[in-house]
A protein has these predicted regions:
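Anionic group-binding determinants
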Residues: 1-146
Length: 146
């Protein structure tokens, strides 16, 4: 699984969300997204997404490819991964191309969210909700992996 935290996204959503966490399954390219108010909520969001992903896929999360941002190197997160048997693969600093799968999906999701808002004439404060909608739509679209 590949993960990345995107943000801060301005303007803030009506729910006070500034960031979104995107996790992408390596085999199927299925995505899970969580809107977050702070970076401190990253570990809890990953726990929720992991439970949902394991229930959906019927397999345990074993490897997580992420960047070197502090939210992924914090003690709480490293302890959680160690206790749950998750191996973390970090990309080199300032090398987003090493985590290209999730970085590219971020671009696709943000672009689609922007297009959804523009097409309906909605204000930018609904970008978070548009991101969730974009992930929902992309998960139901065919990919090369399928």
């Amino acid at each position: 699984m590949h993960g990345d935290l995107f943000g801060p996204v301005m303007p803030v959503t009506p729910g006070g969300r500034l960031f979104f966490l995107l996790l992408v399954d390596d085999a199927t390219r299925f995505m899970w997204v969580s809107l977050l108010t702070t970076k401190l909520a990253t570990t809890d969001a990953i726990k929720r997404i992991q439970a949902e992903a394991e229930k959906t896929c019927g397999r345990k999360l074993r490897v997580l490819r992420i960047d070197n941002d502090w939210e992924f190197t914090a003690t709480e997160f490293t302890d959680y991964c160690a206790n749950d048997g998750i191996t973390r693969h970090y990309s080199a600093p300032y090398s987003p191309q090493q985590n290209g799968i999730v970085e590219r999906r971020n671009q696709t999701v943000v672009g689609m969210a922007r297009a959804l808002l523009k097409q309906r004439g909605m204000p930018a404060k609904f970008r978070g909700e548009a991101v969730v909608t974009a992930v929902h739509l992309l998960n139901r679209s065919p990919t090369k992996s399928l």
